[in-house]
């Protein structure tokens, strides 16, 4: 189980930025993440939105805030992201 004194490097975790669309749950926020991808044949940039649940320990984020998320271990049946920081508060 021990690594014999050698440092084991951890893989880099995904970091995404998105907007909070719901904060009604305790210690959980729903964040809309935008993914831009170029169409393979036509070259048009397509936008796709994905909603993910993220862990917000201190309940600091509110609806409309721009937040930074980091991928983490599964925290519940649907939570795999955690809040790193609130980049910009909603007006």
Swiss-Prot record:
Keywords in alphabetical order: Ribonucleoprotein, Ribosomal protein, RNA-binding, rRNA-binding
Gene Ontology CC annotations of this record: cytosolic small ribosomal subunit
Pfam family, one: Ribosomal_S17
Any one GO MF annotation of this record: structural constituent of ribosome
PROSITE patterns for this protein: RIBOSOMAL_S17
BP-aspect Gene Ontology terms: translation
Function: One of the primary rRNA binding proteins, it binds specifically to the 5'-end of 16S ribosomal RNA.
Family to which the UniProt record says this protein belongs: Belongs to the universal ribosomal protein uS17 family.
Subunit structure, as described in the record: Part of the 30S ribosomal subunit.
Name of the protein in question: Small ribosomal subunit protein uS17
Organism the protein comes from: Saccharopolyspora erythraea (strain ATCC 11635 / DSM 40517 / JCM 4748 / NBRC 13426 / NCIMB 8594 / NRRL 2338)
Gene, per the UniProt record: rpsQ
């Amino acid at each position: 189980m021990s690594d014999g004194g050698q440092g084991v490097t951890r893989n880099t975790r995904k970091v995404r930025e998105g907007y909070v669309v719901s904060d009604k749950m305790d210690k959980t926020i729903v964040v809309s993440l935008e993914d831009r991808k170029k169409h393979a044949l036509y070259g048009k940039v397509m936008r796709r939105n994905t909603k993910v649940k993220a862990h917000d320990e201190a309940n600091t984020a509110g609806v409309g805030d721009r937040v930074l998320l980091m991928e983490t271990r599964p925290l519940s049946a649907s939570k795999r992201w955690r809040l790193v920081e609130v980049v910009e508060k909603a007006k």
